Amino acid sequence: MDENSELGGLETMETLTELGDELTLGDIDEMLQFVSNQVGEFSDLFSEQLCSSFPGGGGGSGSGGTSNNSSGRGTSGGAADPAVQRSFSQVPLSTFSPSSTSPQAPALQVKVSPTPPRATPVLQPRPQPQPQPPAQLQQQTVMITPTFSTAPQTRIIQQPLIYQNAATSFQVLQPQVQSLVTSSQVQPVTIQQQVQTVQAQRVLTQTANGTLQTLAPATVQTVATPQVQQVPVLVQPQIIKTDSLVLTTLKTDGSPVMAAVQNPALTALTAPIQTAALQVPTLVGSNGAILTTMPVMMGQEKVPIKQVPGGVKQLEPPKEGERRTTHNIIEKRYRSSINDKIIELKDLVMGTDAKMHKSGVLRKAIDYIKYLQQVNHKLRQENMVLKLANQKNKLLKGIDLGSLVDSDVDLKIDDFNQNVLLMSPPASDSGSQAGFSPYSIDSEPGSPLLDDAKVKDEPDSPPVALGMVDRSRILLCVLTFLGLSFNPLTSLLQWGGAHNPDQHPYSGSGRNVLSLESGSGGWFDWMMPTLLLWLLNGVIVLSVFVKLLVHGEPVIRPHSRSSVTFWRHRKQADLDLAKGDFAAAAANLQTCLSVLGRALPTSRLDLACSLSWNVIRYSLQKLRLVRWLLKKVFQRWRATPATAAGFEDEAKSSARDAALAYHRLHQLHITGKLPAGSACSDVHMALCAVNLAECAEEKIPPSTLVEIHLTAAMGLKTRCGGKLGFLASYFLNRAQSLCGPEHSAVPDSLRWLCHPLGQKFFMERSWSIKSAAKDSLYCAQRNPADPIAQVHQAFCKHLLERAVEALVKPQAKKKAGDREEESCEFSSALEFLKLLHSFVDSVGFVASPFSSSSVLRSALGPDVVCRWWTSAITVAISWLQGDDAAVRSHFTEVERVPKALEVTESPLVKAVFYACRAMHASLSGKADGQQNSFCHCERASGHLWSSLNVSGTTSDPSLNHVVQLLTCDLLLSLRTTLWQKQASASQLLGETYHASGTELAGFQRDLGSLRRLAHSFRPAYRKVFLHEATVRLMAGASPTRTHQLLEHSLRRRTTQNTKHGEVDTWPGQRERATAILLACRHLPLSFLSSPGQRAVLLAEAARTLEKVGDRRSCSDCQQMIVKLGGGTAIAAS
């Protein structure tokens, strides 16, 4: 070999040389003890790696075995298994002759250049040496001179070190105690013949270029012969290609045993040897280079390495910190194993390309495990549903219902009790009574899910309680009707009377004496057959009623297994409704109906039969005679000892459960949460819910009964339209009658329907129920699956709109003498607001997961959003009326803006809020009160302009327009009031006040907002002329144009011969009175009529302002009248 190759191998061994200069064999023994202790503590960690090195258990065969690691990462074993070490140490030592060994084991010599002494380095990962071509691999040989020697004791020393660098490649270092560099002249040493333990060759992979880096630790064996000198042999780490790697074992007879390695992912080569001859595990490259370590015998005594001849120099004793190196290496290996598993977990859960830290990987893994558990739970439920459907099909073919939970379907009671916690939803109330299930709601009986004593092994129901199919009911009704129509009993009785033997004539020979028949029978003879006939018909009809309404109704026992199945799906449906999973809730509710024996119709024929039967049943239940007969039949069943006690209660409970299931399905259908079905299907579910709820009687709360009737009315109005509108009105009146004469039984959430305005809105207004309604700015969010809550939300917005419209565009009403007169603006608005405030106090906006009677009912509580708008409009009305105390009292509620409105960041809400603050600040008696009011007006004006510029569709456009008009009118009126106060103060001082540029700019901006709003909302025109005249007065403009604008508000108009929509643009009474005040106060005398006519106008304005309730303006008008009566000039300025 050339000198460059030798220098390249020397550079690779620098670190190993530095580590071995300062250690002794005593240190090696201490390290071995420490490692063996670590093996005892981490037995699981080392046993896995040991098994990968020694296939087949603890011992190995004579031939070397290979083991492939699927992960592609190399592992290094710790200490050898003690059992393996004992098995090797018990073999007696033998000797071999030099003649037999020398020719078969040729002398090998290691050519290594001398290395200068260097300081002891600290163990740390270093970059992997670049792989070199196989042709440049150096061949290392060791000269061996065998002699005979014996040793009473042997010791196995091995401790490989593994490091991992940042480039995802592995570096394998030699054990510290064996890392010594020999001189270029190797002295002969004695080699013991018996090799007791040969450490498995470690081959590490997963490098960037697909090569293997291997380093075989030297197996060292010591003997007690004092003449033996120890020479540690170091073999340089080599980089070889996996395609040319060959495993060979050198024997004493010279015949190598070769095993080709074909798998590039080879991670470990093991060669435990136990033979009489010397065997050395060797890796041979494609060019014949030997890349392995020869076992060398060492002395038994702890001879310091510094005393070994051969040019090894004495170094300083090892430092104390280096003794923990092995412990740190083990810890790093332990952490490396954990990191590998976390990486494998990441690849399984998120894929190989995902990047996430360890805690995130574990969190995702936990979430994925929970998801798999949920999927398993749903699959288990689907399996249960399919089994139930299979049993139902068998039931229709004549199989007993008791086979529903037979042992053939693997639903034994023991397995069910073990898995009930996984199949049942969590408890809704931790404080439930012991007699009820923790999974039941308070107002309904508990389900025996966890009580073994309650789950009976009896059949689900007696044969009579299985129920009849609706087709069978209709067939029986048709046969009964045909029987009563044709009445075959009449012909039967007549035939029996004709064949009476007493009336047969004598047919013998002779004469008969004529005689008269006596009429002793009288009227009873012809009445008796008729009475008997009707009696028989009545018995037949009564039997049919009993069969249909008593025996034909399916009833389940409270603690049967069918009841358990029903309650399990019922609770799951409640949870799905609370989570918003309406499709899953509908599936569970349909399963509940199937368990109850009331499956939904699947074909048109079944739907027609079911709908017809429910119409007939609802008609029969209204007959008092039928209800009395059914009650007597139930009492007879109760008194009969052969039947189960409480059959009537069980029947009512089953009817209640079925009614609630039908009711909730009906709610989901009419709110659009499920795929749209036919109108007949909705009517069918509504009638089923009503019929069964009335059959339940006292088992169902009155509030729930009212809710079921109202939902049926809504379903008929929305789905059937005008065709069956009278039925919607009938069910609405029926619901009101159930509330009692004083509406004592009606819940607070339904009280609005008992008000005349609520009834009128329900029947006349064109409201609609949407499946995905937009979030409203004026009402809090209601339960999306409750149609009554959605209609109530529409009614609240309707009342709010009516209240604001009464302020901005009051409607004219006709009295007896055909004299048109506007209604009082403020009183009508306050009436609507008071009614709205009473209705929003009892209806909430969040659906409760487990409410008292219905999951879909909104939780009780006030609608804080609608209440805030009510308070804001009340503050505006109070300020316009001049009621300062009411403004201050209601302003405290306006300051508390709900969080739902704060989140929206709506500019209209901010405009209303700052307008209310400006009105409140204008009432302050402080010096800076008017300035603060002006600042709030500026901020409100900016937000109002932003709300007008907002593009996009809103959920309530008409309500937005009236609120924007009211806010703009309030800001302009407030600015006018502030200007008049300053002008009045200047008049008292004898000065003339002119509005500043800032005041005029703010007024012009609000006036521009009013003009822009008038383009899309015509009622805003009635305010435009008045405020245009006001801004001209503030600016001191020409009074001619100002007088024309005021005349536009002063003229009276009639509604005759007017086009549609023009009435909305005419000024109202309040605008006319305000125009009179402005003209009399600010216009010159030349533009006004005589003083007598001026007094008439002021008196008329005073009456108008007093009627509408504007106290502030009315007081100003009366003061002007007083001044005019005293002879003071009104317009001296």
Curated annotation (Swiss-Prot):
Residues 322-372 form the bHLH domain. This is Sterol regulatory element-binding protein 2. Gene3D superfamilies: Helix-loop-helix DNA-binding domain (4.10.280.10). Residues 372-393 are annotated as: Leucine-zipper. The record marks D460, S461, L476, C477, L514, S515 as: Cleavage. Belongs to the SREBP family. It comes from the Eukaryota. Residues 495-525 are lumenal. It comes from Rattus norvegicus. Residues 229-483 are annotated as: Interaction with LMNA.
